[in-house]
Amino acid sequence: DQPRSRGLGDVYKRQALPYALFDPAISGASEKDQYNGRIVFDGVVESARTALANGIPVGLGNDVGCPYVTQYDFWRELCYFHKYCGVSNQFALHTATLRNARLAGVGDVTGSIEAGKSADFIVTRKNPLDDLAALRQLELVVCRGRAVHKPAPKRNKTVDALLDPYLV
């Protein structure tokens, strides 16, 4: 267990993506910013792949305070993890739930649906095992046993339109 390695870099992949891949006219990145963003982006992807290949746990996260990161789109992290690191949808879901809980030291409380654990889960319209983008359309969110039916977060259509092409 390497406490300093917990939550390895997926958040940096997300923060670097606009600088690395967006048209500079959209991101406002200079040529140097774009070059550096690409180095960071590629480095984080390679680090995550190497960690996975060597049995080192990788967690998923995002940083809502950063440009192009919203409070409602953590599901994108799973899609990017699948696309850029080559993991299965099932492994991406496992990483975002039980693995993250274990890395955070709360795997005995949450992260999976088991007797005695907090009732924290979502219900989607479609099966995320088939397509992780199904996580975008929530029917139900349950947190500590409290249900929110048909949650309707205020979406930033501009950010969604800019990021959606990088899902496929």
Question: Which residues fall in each region the model found?
Answer:
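His/Asp/Glu-enriched, well-ordered alpha-helical/loop segment
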Residues: 29-33, 40-127, 147
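Active-site gating loops and adjacent loop-to-helix segments of metal-dependent hydrolytic enzymes
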Residues: 10-41
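Short peripheral tails and domain-boundary helices/loops at the edges of structured domains
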Residues: 141-155
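A cross-family glycoside hydrolase active-site/sugar-binding cleft signature
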Residues: 14-16, 61-63, 141
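Short, compositionally biased
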Residues: 134-142
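Small/polar (Gly/Ser/Thr/Ala-rich) solvent-exposed segments
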Residues: 130
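Single conserved hydrophobic/aromatic residue that forms the stacking wall/gate
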Residues: 1-12
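Glycine- and charge-enriched low-complexity intrinsically disordered segments
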Residues: 155-168
